[in-house]
């Protein structure tokens, strides 16, 4: 995510919860401010940087992508794999069961590997029986890419940090959780203080997650006059601000 709330995919912006930048513990006001500022910056960047016509190379890439989609859609309609409705329900249930508030690392790892294996030949292993199911088939693929990225991040955090935030990591060797009568309900890995000053980055397909140190807050001279002057400079010469990170 750069200063314009543009993701690593050029032209794709994310703000608010979708950006995943709020952190584990944050005041509600800062989350709201981040959402509002991010949306504003993204809108400005879209307006100021979209004045150029697409290059010949970009048009060729779009046409090639359209042809790939046509062929992949034909494969879905001819496929004899798992039907899209069954596929979606199966993965949704597994995520809720193993990767919700209670997290099972072994089952999450198995689910991650299953999703990665399916993505390697998604169109050959998925079937859309009617044209109406084609949109869901494409959404399922996006769901699996997202699912694998989320599981990568959760597994990395579980291994390094234990139970943290709203996620309890279950383990037979963990600390017992008891009800009001002292009866043991389950055992969970205690929270570790490691990586409190780090953020978790997930990138790539297949996804890889890693911790990186957070950046210190910059010391800025953010008076109204200076902020307004910078805004006007962005409007006058947007190309200077297109690739700011």
Spell out what each predicted region is:
Residues 1-14, 18-245:
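Glycine- and aromatic-enriched mobile tails/lids
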């Amino acid at each position: 995510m750069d200063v314009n709330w543009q993701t690593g995919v050029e032209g794709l912006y994310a703000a608010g919860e979708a950006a995943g930048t709020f952190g584990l513990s944050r005041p509600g006001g800062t989350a709201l401010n981040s959402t509002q500022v991010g949306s504003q910056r993204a809108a400005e960047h879209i307006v100021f940087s979209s004045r150029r016509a697409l290059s010949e190379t970009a048009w060729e890439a779009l046409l090639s992508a359209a042809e790939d989609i046509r062929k992949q859609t034909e494969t879905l309609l001819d496929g004899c794999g798992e039907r899209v409705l069954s596929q979606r329900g199966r993965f949704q249930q597994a995520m809720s069961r193993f990767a919700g508030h209670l997290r099972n690392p072994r089952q999450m790892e198995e689910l991650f590997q299953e999703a990665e294996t399916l993505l390697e030949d998604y169109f050959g292993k998925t079937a859309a029986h009617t044209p109406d199911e084609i949109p869901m088939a494409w959404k399922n693929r996006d769901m699996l890419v997202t699912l694998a990225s989320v599981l990568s991040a959760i597994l990395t955090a579980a291994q390094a940090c234990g139970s943290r935030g709203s996620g309890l990591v279950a383990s037979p060797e963990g600390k017992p959780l008891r009800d009001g009568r002292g009866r043991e309900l389950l055992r969970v890995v205690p929270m570790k203080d490691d990586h409190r000053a780090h953020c978790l980055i997930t990138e790539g397909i297949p996804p890889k997650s890693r911790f990186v140190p957070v950046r210190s807050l910059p010391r800025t001279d953010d008076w109204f006059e200076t902020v307004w002057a910078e805004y006007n400079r962005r409007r006058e010469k947007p190309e200077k601000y297109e690739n700011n990170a």
